Amino acid sequence: MGGNLVLKLAGELGASAPRQLRSVVGVSPAIDLGLSAAALHLPQNRLYERRFLRNLIRRFRRKVRLFPRAFDPNRATGIRSLREFDDRITALYSGFASAEDYYFRAAAARVIDRIAVPTLILHALDDPFVHITPETLAKIEANPHITLLQSAHGGHCAFLAKSDPTAGDEGYWAETTLLRFVFAHC
């Protein structure tokens, strides 16, 4: 979610971004939140969804213990999908009308065309959770401030390459690429 958040902030700031914000990087960002939530619910991704959901429910229960008057512990009972969690908990406690409202309003896709600082997005075409809609892709490609690097493989955040010890490259393609980008814009 961090990639979506930083891209959304950059889009909301647009041309008014402070000069200290020199560049932005998103690695496998869930730019279209609803699409990512739907992808997590696919049978082949249910293991990941269950893990994310278990962690979210654990965090929610911790908040209930810390702030018992602010949160209803029964809201988490029987939740079986990320979308259901977002509908019953995230939306309710974050001021959204529903999960769909949350996915729309919290998505970087809505404002990505307004990004006005050098931005790098790394995305793997075989990412099982993060898919970019054609409409969002068109916005990204039309924005001269955004560099989109898409690899055929990499899944969700597993961008590796052949290492080159003589060049100090250990095969961490994403890390090497984003550092070069950030240092080029310092």
Language-model region placement:
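Conserved loop-alpha-helix segment in the C-terminal half of the alpha/beta-hydrolase fold
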Residues: 125, 129-147, 151
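Hydrophobic/aromatic beta-strand patches that form the interior of the parallel beta-sheet core
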Residues: 25-27, 120-122, 149
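Short, conserved loop/helix-junction motifs that constitute active-site signature segments
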Residues: 18-19, 112-116, 139-143
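Short conserved micro-motifs at the rims of enzyme active sites and ligand-binding pockets
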Residues: 36-37, 132-133, 159-163
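Short beta-strand/loop motif that positions the catalytic acidic residue
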Residues: 115, 121-123, 127
